[in-house]
């Protein structure tokens, strides 16, 4: 069982068949469940380009990413877990669908050789 995080309600989703571990995946990518946009900006202040963290979104069951852009400013974007059984994620763009690492790089508009979770 995995917990889908939401500011309003925690929901559980059965993911037995695939073995996809939602919480483990999120924590590998700098999951910060208790912070908002302003706190994310403070945490990322002074970090290198494409450093990111994940957090709950204030919009329903969505998740949010906060990351440092090329210009040094922090950008925020949202994405959704569309298939908890297989760990398929999606951002608003039709080609931003796939595994969490792929969708993260798509949102940051960088390759897999760039970008690192905040430590």
For the regions a language model picked out, list residue spans one by one.
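Eukaryotic phosphotyrosine signaling hubs
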Residues: 1-119
């Amino acid at each position: 069982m995995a917990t889908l995080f939401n500011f309003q309600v925690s929901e559980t989703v059965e993911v037995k068949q695939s073995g996809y571990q939602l919480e483990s995946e999120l924590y590998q990518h700098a999951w910060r469940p208790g912070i908002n946009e302003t706190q994310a900006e403070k945490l990322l202040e002074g970090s290198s380009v494409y450093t990111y963290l994940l957090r709950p979104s204030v919009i329903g069951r969505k998740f949010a990413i906060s990351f440092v852009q090329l210009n040094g400013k922090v950008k925020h974007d949202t994405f959704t877990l569309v298939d908890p059984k297989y760990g398929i994620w999606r951002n608003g763009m039709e080609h931003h669908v796939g595994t969490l690492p792929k969708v993260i790089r798509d949102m940051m508009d960088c390759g897999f050789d760039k970008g690192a979770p905040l430590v």
